[in-house]
């Protein structure tokens, strides 16, 4: 691993997609630079800020002030906080508001918020006037290291998570690390699961660094910015090689097949944050891999131990209300996984593991062993 980067200067990570490439700018004070960066990127553009009620209280005034200082016209669209907005109704609200604001194809949409806002605003941008450019200003750790990068946008369906959407790359990502200071501990932990994912799937050295430096990452400063930049570089590299997820990019879904099914089973509610579902999903994927003889059992245990040490759930029994409200049975979870975006010709595709730092795409997994595995895991005390 390289030494942590100097937090006093912004870190720039390039997403190399030719004429559709863009920069991820990481560092404190990014929101204050929003107006200046947009002026340089798109002189004369008007903007529409899409945000949620919670983010609006903390960060909308700073974003608006930055735009005002550079004379950029702006309107604001505020949606409800949480997955409830990542819906057909939420999409209609944002699309109609963009049309009413007369945002044109030479203007910019600004997604100021976490993963829900970024996915929603990005998808609306992809379809209004057959395509508006947008800027991601992610305000959660999860969004900064994952959902704001790579162009996946969309909403949920009653049938499952992220089933309606489009690939639509942003033109700029501004990851202001100062906003992370206002996250609740639970929100920060949920985002940290996605950071761990990058080490687990492709960088054993980064995983070991996370084990040694987790406390420093929580405290902030150079270690936190290094973790974010390393995660963004990992994702940017994969996206540049496989933008449309025809191969390698599927590895970034480690933990997501199980995790998305658990999110759907809990009604996309606050019982289980997305990152928490990914944490449980990664452990399930690792343990299933170990049972198949693909991965040393001690590596699966090591992954589980680090996530537990970070305060994340690692078992389905850790989901809020599991004992009182229960959870879907194995057959119901299998039905939810059958709606996964990675299903091809009706066959499940899993991201499994051979070791810490080495994930693989498995297209040959029969449903019966997965169902039996889930049944046993659900029955654990």
Curated annotation (Swiss-Prot):
What GO terms describe the biological role, i.e. biological process, of this protein?
Answer: amino acid biosynthetic process; aromatic amino acid family biosynthetic process; chorismate biosynthetic process
**Keyword field contains Glycoprotein:** no
Query: Which species is this UniProt entry from?
Result: Rhodopseudomonas palustris (strain BisA53)
Coiled-coil stretches are none
Q: What is its main location?
A: cytoplasm
Give UniProt keywords alphabetically. Amino-acid biosynthesis, Aromatic amino acid biosynthesis, Cobalt, Cytoplasm, Lyase, Metal-binding, NAD, Nucleotide-binding, Zinc
Q: Which reaction does it catalyse?
A: 7-phospho-2-dehydro-3-deoxy-D-arabino-heptonate = 3-dehydroquinate + phosphate
What is the official name of this protein in its record?
3-dehydroquinate synthase
What does the record give as the function of this protein?
Answer: Catalyzes the conversion of 3-deoxy-D-arabino-heptulosonate 7-phosphate (DAHP) to dehydroquinate (DHQ).
Identify which cofactors the protein needs according to its UniProt entry: Co(2+); Zn(2+); NAD(+)
Q: How is the cofactor bound?
A: Binds 1 divalent metal cation per subunit. Can use either Co(2+) or Zn(2+).
Q: Name one GO cellular component term.
A: cytoplasm
Which Enzyme Commission number(s) are on file for it?
Answer: 4.2.3.4
Q: Where does NAD(+) bind?
A: 81-86, 115-119, 139-140, 152, 161
Q: Where in the cell is it found?
A: Cytoplasm
């Amino acid at each position: 691993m390289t030494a942590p980067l100097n937090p006093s200067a912004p870190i720039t990570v390039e997403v190399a997609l030719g004429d559709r490439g863009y920069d991820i700018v990481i560092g404190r004070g990014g929101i204050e630079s929003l107006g200046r960066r947009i002026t340089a990127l798109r002189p004369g553009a008007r903007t529409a800020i899409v945000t949620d009620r919670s983010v609006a209280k903390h960060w909308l005034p700073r974003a608006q002030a930055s735009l005002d200082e550079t004379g950029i016209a702006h309107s604001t669209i505020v949606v409800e906080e949480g997955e409830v907005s990542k819906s057909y109704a939420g999409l209609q609200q944002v699309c109609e508001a963009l049309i009413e604001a007369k945002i044109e194809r030479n203007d910019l949409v600004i997604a100021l918020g976490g993963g829900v806002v970024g996915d929603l605003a990005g998808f609306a941008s992809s379809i209004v006037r057959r395509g508006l450019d947008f800027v991601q200003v992610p305000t959660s750790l999860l969004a900064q290291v994952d959902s704001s990068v790579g162009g996946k946008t969309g909403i949920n369906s009653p049938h499952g998570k992220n089933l309606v959407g489009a690939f639509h790359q942003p033109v700029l990502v501004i990851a202001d690390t100062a906003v992370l200071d206002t996250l609740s501990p639970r929100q920060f932990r949920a985002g940290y699961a996605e950071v761990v994912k990058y080490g687990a799937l492709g960088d054993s050295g980064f995983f070991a660094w996370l084990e040694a430096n987790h406390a420093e990452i929580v405290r902030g400063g150079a270690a936190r910015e290094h973790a974010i930049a390393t995660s963004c570089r990992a994702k940017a590299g994969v996206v540049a090689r496989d933008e449309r997820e025809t191969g390698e990019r599927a590895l970034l879904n480690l933990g997501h097949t199980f995790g998305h099914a658990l999110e759907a089973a809990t009604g996309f509610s606050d019982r289980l944050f997305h990152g928490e579902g990914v944490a449980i999903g990664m452990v399930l994927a690792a343990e299933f891999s170990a049972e198949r003889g693909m991965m040393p059992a001690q590596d699966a245990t090591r992954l589980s131990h680090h996530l537990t040490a970070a305060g994340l759930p690692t078992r389905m029994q850790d989901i809020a209300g599991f004992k009182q409200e229960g959870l879907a049975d194995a057959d119901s979870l299998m039905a939810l996984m059958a709606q996964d975006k990675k299903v091809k010709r009706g066959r499940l595709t899993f991201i499994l593991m051979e070791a810490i730092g080495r994930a693989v795409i498995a297209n040959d997994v029969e449903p019966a062993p997965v169902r039996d595995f889930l049944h046993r895991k659900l029955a654990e005390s």
